[in-house]
Swiss-Prot record:
Belongs to the eukaryotic NMN adenylyltransferase family. Changing residue 380 to R: Switches localization from nuclear to cytoplasmic. One of its GO terms (cellular component) is mitochondrion. The gene is Nmnat. GO terms for molecular function: ATP binding; nicotinamide-nucleotide adenylyltransferase activity; nicotinate-nucleotide adenylyltransferase activity; unfolded protein binding. This is Nicotinamide-nucleotide adenylyltransferase. Induction: Overall expression and the relative expression of the alternatively spliced RB mRNA (encoding isoforms B and D) is increased by heat shock (acute stress) and proteotoxic stress (chronic stress). Pfam families: CTP_transf_like (PF01467). One of its GO terms (biological process) is NAD biosynthetic process via the salvage pathway. Pathway: Cofactor biosynthesis; NAD(+) biosynthesis; NAD(+) from nicotinamide D-ribonucleotide: step 1/1; Cofactor biosynthesis; NAD(+) biosynthesis; deamido-NAD(+) from nicotinate D-ribonucleotide: step 1/1. Its EC number is 2.7.7.1, 2.7.7.18.
Length: 389
């Protein structure tokens, strides 16, 4: 029996059939695979950017990217080429806001296992707090210029002059990449709070970029869109995606548990948790730091910057508590302590901090708060002093 497959007549499928005129000479499986891949390559390209404190970054922050990507790929309407995390500037001033340096380091560690979600530290390197609209526009402009410039014809993955957040493979096509703001329902609801957002910024974000909103099961984000004239006007640019696997672990909860000396094991990425312990962030309380020293390739580079050699140094803060940004208005600036408290590994020297270069047998100082452990502490310091600086 011969089964005929009727493909929907549109520009994408027509272009695929034109390119694959030799379909009949291919095996059925190869023919179908080639057709599917070609169809995907012709879909409009999009990328996501999430703005916020990320103090610290939680698994749910990263899950939002995966949930959004799954949605668009299952709908078959767009091809997701990248995800960007942009921590807010230090001058945002929320309680519990670790220094930009620490937040960037934690985001970098949290995204090590992802091949498409990356850190952008552009925002934290500005002279002041930036509006979300300005952050979106900067990254969109950079992507546009990169695509239009042709990038010198080389593989952009090998170009060390490009920022690390830039999605790979942008030159596979000259088609544009549309950058969308990825957020939770709380941010959508905050649009309705008087004085938190400039109406011009809301309109620009929704009209020219678009929103991808991850909502909780049982919530009604459509009501907030209906109650807003601006959101209703551009509701075709707002994608609502329900998260059917709820995760209520927030940055606020993590900071609260750490401040109480309670365990957050399995609530955070192990590397992020170890970094928090070693840097003693968020009023971390523990008698000992007992985690085993990790191999050199997993040791933290406290001087991480996003391919920016002129990046500023950031210190570790002592502040506690408060949720992620739910508005576009900063709080009064908080002062941070100008010195680091632990030795850290890396190739970039920092002012006011001691940096150990990578090498075989490298160790990280273990901090102890017990006075009767001086002997053990001295022995560890002696081992560290043997490492060539």
């Amino acid at each position: 029996m011969i089964v005929k497959i009727s493909w929907p007549k549109n520009n994408i499928t027509s272009e695929c059939f034109r390119r694959f005129g030799s379909f009949k000479r291919r095996s059925k499986s190869k023919k179908m695979s080639a057709f599917i891949e070609e169809t995907k390559s012709l879909l409009p390209r999009i990328a996501f950017i999430a703005c916020g404190c990320f103090s610290p970054p939680t698994p749910m922050h990263l899950r939002m990217f995966e949930i959004a990507k799954d949605h668009f790929e299952m709908q078959g309407t767009h091809r997701v080429v990248g995800g960007i995390i942009s921590p807010t500037h230090d001058s945002y001033g929320k309680k519990g806001l670790a220094s930009a340096l620490d937040r960037c380091a934690m985001v970098k560690l949290a995204t090590q296992s992802s091949n498409w979600i990356r850190l952008s530290d552009w925002e934290v390197h500005q002279n002041q707090w930036m509006r979300t609209q300005a952050v979106l526009q900067h990254h969109q402009n950079y992507i546009n210029n990169h695509i239009n410039s042709g990038g010198g014809g080389g593989d952009d993955g090998e170009n060390t002059h490009l920022p690390g957040w830039l999605p790979r493979g942008l030159h596979d096509s000259r088609d544009p990449v549309h950058l969308k703001l990825l957020c939770g329902a709380d941010l959508l609801e905050s649009f309705a709070v008087p004085g938190l957002w400039a109406e011009a910024d809301i309109e620009d974000i929704v009209a020219n970029h678009g929103l991808v909103v991850i909502t909780r099961a049982g919530s009604n984000p459509g009501k907030f869109i209906f109650d807003s004239d601006i959101l209703t006007k551009y509701q075709s640019n707002i994608t609502l995606i329900t998260n059917w696997v709820p995760n209520e672990v927030s940055s606020t909860l993590i900071r609260r548990l750490l401040g109480r000396g309670q365990s957050v094991k399995y609530l955070l990425d192990d590397l992020v948790l170890e970094y928090i312990k070693r840097q003693r962030l968020f009023n971390f309380k523990s008698k000992y730091i007992t985690d085993a020293v990790r191999p050199n390739h997993l040791l933290f580079n406290h001087a991480y910057t996003d391919n920016n050699k002129n990046a500023n140094s950031y210190s570790i803060g002592d502040q506690l508590e408060q949720d992620m940004d739910e508005s576009d208005t900063p709080s009064p600036q908080l002062q941070h302590t100008p010195t680091s408290r632990v030795f850290c590994c890396g190739e970039v020297p920092l002012r006011g901090s001691k940096v150990l270069r990578s090498g075989p047998g490298q160790a990280v100082q273990v901090i102890t708060m017990q006075a009767d452990e001086k002997e053990e502490s001295q022995a560890k310091k002696q081992k560290i002093s043997q490492v060539q600086l």
